[in-house]
Amino acid sequence: MKKTTVLFIAIGLTIFLQAQDSTTFKFSVNHLALSVKDVNRSAEFYSKVLMLSEITNRSKIEGIRWFVLGDGRELHLISVIKENVTINKALHLGLSTANFDAFVKRITTLKIPYSDWPGKSNTVNIRADGIKQIFFQDPDGYWIEVNSVAQ
């Protein structure tokens, strides 16, 4: 009887503890924040090159500007932090467009240098899965990938 009682208590405690640990969190990306030197220069780049729409900076802090990335996601440009940021190509903003070829023509017209992943100038990279991609940099040196996943 004692063994059965202990077994039921152990099972009940295990179920109770598992129920406590079963809380999961479903996250979604809300925004990407970039530390920039000149918020107005960066804002002009993102609105002109990527044609992002500016939205109200709800933080109401000077030196910060917000843009719509799409699907409820935002880009926040922040110039109030003056620390240096180390940037390399592995840290990049990846964007997809159904109009990939038209976008490549657009940045070519705007004379914005782009490359494939290895760094060959004016070259479109084609991944093993057939997705086209290019990489270019914003005024602060952040890498941006635009790819054809949405096609």
What do the predicted segments below correspond to?
Residues 38-40, 93-140, 151:
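Vicinal oxygen chelate
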Residues 64-109:
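Mid-chain, structured segments of secreted extracytoplasmic proteins
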Residues 1-24:
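Bacterial Sec-dependent N-terminal signal peptides
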Residues 26-28, 85-90, 127-128:
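Short glycine-enriched loop/turn motifs at secondary-structure junctions
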Residues 20-40, 91-95:
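N-terminal beta-strand motif that seeds the catalytic metal site of vicinal oxygen chelate
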Residues 32, 65, 133-136:
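Generic short beta-strand
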Residues 34-74:
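Core segments of cupin and vicinal oxygen chelate
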